[in-house]
């Protein structure tokens, strides 16, 4: 079995790691960075991911073709409250797909969130392949612990579109605990993983038991908020800067996409700086202009001001901590270690609030940007058989059930149940002689069915006519290790059965995914052709420039007819270079090389002549060097 890589597919940044020996290792990308910005830019002929995509964002078109924070949309419906909020703040267009999902618009076409996220995963795959020197097909991908079934399934779809076989989906805090606890000794531990990333927040309570060298990582409880993260902190500061500028200049920058992009980048930079300094200046010259001339932004921001802007967001993250502890039947005194994961945890206020809640400082020996990918790589090692002494017991974050009479949700699997798990329950009909039942699958904690997340529904038909309450319909929930749900319903009398793997009521069908996989492969081929064409054009440029220089240096030594042949070949190559036919360019390069053979001979003769001349001068100098200068003193003979 080949290497199984670990990928942290983040809202703001992504990271890839692999097990190197018995230790997880983060792999640097082509730009030399250990994390890659989850930014995708579509330009003419190619797709840029990471820092190159961010550069396009700033320099060319900041809105239409540059996408970021797509993880906030993955597996979500367009009508979701969180999506509607994002529509107001995102510079790109969020649209409603035919199936009701939240998609984005780029390159003049609608694109599914998994399809866009697949571009980041492809970059992670290529980064790993460049490092390992072999093709990579297997991956463990992490998701926020509080992702619902639809979001986890959509993440798995993104992996398939990227050409990866997703061996396992695991929760981000669980992965961080794996990375942290792998080389720790000293008995059993109960750890709290506080994970505040770019777009999501999770808290997991995890117990690490060690028996005879084998470690068991058991998730006791998890909670969170899938729409709370660093992007929300950024937006608070962005709005403050825009409002202040409006007060000073009377100009609303929200109507200027390019200006807003500059403000966004400046706000992110200021937020980071304020983690290590008490104040900073946001200085943006020529941020916009009106009839009176150019306008500049220069606003001083203090750490105290930033903290006042985001205090409620930090406070919002503390509520899930209380719920998770209660679900685990623990108190803060039972927590051995606190681990901070996610870039936003670098903010001093976040660290202070978490320390205050747990009554202890968080560990400092965990890299918040890399721990999740490293843990995913450990799980990859477990699945590949490279790690033998680790057992991971993850949980489902939300309860699963079906809608029953009276629009009530009846739970079959309670939240925080260890996965994989299987549960079944027998139901009956609500009316006499009912020949079919609809199984409506739900996820959530509310008793009223409509307040929970609808995962899908299907019909079981052909039930024998009988009084209400007599038929026995056995519903089975089978939740796999990825947290993906498989549901079956069986009429115990007739033996008729219906099975489905739950997809969101919407989501991508297998046909959709297969089409996107083919598109990705087609783009891969197109990208390769684009790169080959660019290389051919560059070679043509070099050939034209070099040949013209040699013609000039040859001067009258080059016969006129040879010069005409060369000029004609150059002209033909210039024409071919403007086209898109790589083979035509290569052929004209070869033709120019043939036409310039006489020129090469002349250049060689001139070089030999210069060398010979240089040798003669050197010999002359050598002879002169053999003459020894001496000082003379005339001695007069006094003897006469």
From Swiss-Prot:
<dbReference type="GO" id="GO:0140662">
    <property type="term" value="F:ATP-dependent protein folding chaperone"/>
</dbReference>
<feature type="modified residue" description="Phosphothreonine; by autocatalysis">
    <location>
        <position position="200"/>
    </location>
</feature>
<dbReference type="Pfam" id="PF00012">
    <property type="entry name" value="HSP70"/>
</dbReference>
<dbReference type="GO" id="GO:0051082">
    <property type="term" value="F:unfolded protein binding"/>
</dbReference>
<keyword id="KW-0547">Nucleotide-binding</keyword>
<keyword id="KW-0346">Stress response</keyword>
<comment type="function">
    <text>Acts as a chaperone.</text>
</comment>
<keyword id="KW-0143">Chaperone</keyword>
<dbReference type="InterPro" id="IPR012725">
    <property type="entry name" value="Chaperone_DnaK"/>
</dbReference>
<feature type="compositionally biased region" description="Low complexity">
    <location>
        <begin position="607"/>
        <end position="622"/>
    </location>
</feature>
<dbReference type="InterPro" id="IPR018181">
    <property type="entry name" value="Heat_shock_70_CS"/>
</dbReference>
<dbReference type="InterPro" id="IPR029048">
    <property type="entry name" value="HSP70_C_sf"/>
</dbReference>
<protein>
    <recommendedName>
        <fullName>Chaperone protein DnaK</fullName>
    </recommendedName>
</protein>
<keyword id="KW-0597">Phosphoprotein</keyword>
<dbReference type="InterPro" id="IPR043129">
    <property type="entry name" value="ATPase_NBD"/>
</dbReference>
<dbReference type="InterPro" id="IPR029047">
    <property type="entry name" value="HSP70_peptide-bd_sf"/>
</dbReference>
<comment type="similarity">
    <text>Belongs to the heat shock protein 70 family.</text>
</comment>
<dbReference type="InterPro" id="IPR013126">
    <property type="entry name" value="Hsp_70_fam"/>
</dbReference>
<feature type="compositionally biased region" description="Acidic residues">
    <location>
        <begin position="623"/>
        <end position="640"/>
    </location>
</feature>
<dbReference type="GO" id="GO:0005524">
    <property type="term" value="F:ATP binding"/>
</dbReference>
<keyword id="KW-0067">ATP-binding</keyword>
<feature type="region of interest" description="Disordered">
    <location>
        <begin position="607"/>
        <end position="640"/>
    </location>
</feature>
